[in-house]
């Protein structure tokens, strides 16, 4: 779910509850809440493709990657344990698969960082962000 810039009626939150306070650091609280809302109101989440949202942030790429690492490290497994039927939809199956290790590893990360210095392409940025999240999830299993 992409939950940014969502308008929710108070009555919906009264039925589903607020953010899960067991999520202890950055990330995932909106996804977890969206799952609960979708369970109670499966046909009521809609998106408007014409809506425009501009998000200004002064975070650097490294700060954002650190946030995504923390999300993977601290919160993602709690969400999967709470909602195991969303494991595949949230991409958890890929993290420990052969394909996941082939895609998200230190070689591909370093190559991506090198290429990012040459060309500022948004796919390189997205890869690094997702890779940081995957690293966090993998490290959470090791701790």
What label would you give each PLM region?
Residues 5-8, 12-17, 23-51:
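A short, conserved alpha-helix in the catalytic core of glycosyltransferases
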Residues 30, 34, 68-73:
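Amphipathic alpha-helical segments in well-structured domains
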Residues 76, 80, 84-94:
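Domain-length accessory/inserted modules outside core catalytic folds
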Residues 70-71, 88-143:
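Non-catalytic, C-terminal membrane-associated alpha-helical segments of glycosyltransferases
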Residues 17-18, 27-28, 74, 136-143:
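Glycine-centered small-residue hotspots that permit tight backbone geometry or close packing
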Residues 1-3:
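An anion-binding catalytic pocket shared by soluble metabolic enzymes
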